[in-house]
Amino acid sequence: MPLRPVLLFYGRASCSPCTEARDSLQWILEDRASRGELVPVVRDLDVATDPDLERRYGALVPVVVIGDAELPLVTSVRQLRAFLDATLPLLA
């Protein structure tokens, strides 16, 4: 079985847009799995725990990264779904 791609989710524990984006991501990934589509492994990273991550992503959270593709300031299900639909097939 091929390895599943890794999706990095950068956020903060005390960030309501991050919580909303996490919930949206979970819903989208469950939907993808139910349709037999590729679902990445998700690594949730809190930028507040690492000064380098805070400098790079602090003003942009929530941020989703797959491979070399980044989606900063994730704000909608449509935006997140389009990002996954565009990036995941390239890694399959």
PLM region spans:
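Local sequence-structure signature of Cys/Sec-based thiol-disulfide redox active-site neighborhoods
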Residues: 1-31
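Alpha-helix termini
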Residues: 29-37, 91
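Thiol-based oxidoreductase modules, predominantly thioredoxin-like and allied folds used
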Residues: 37-51
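Non-catalytic, surface beta->alpha helical segment in thiol-disulfide oxidoreductase systems
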Residues: 66-92
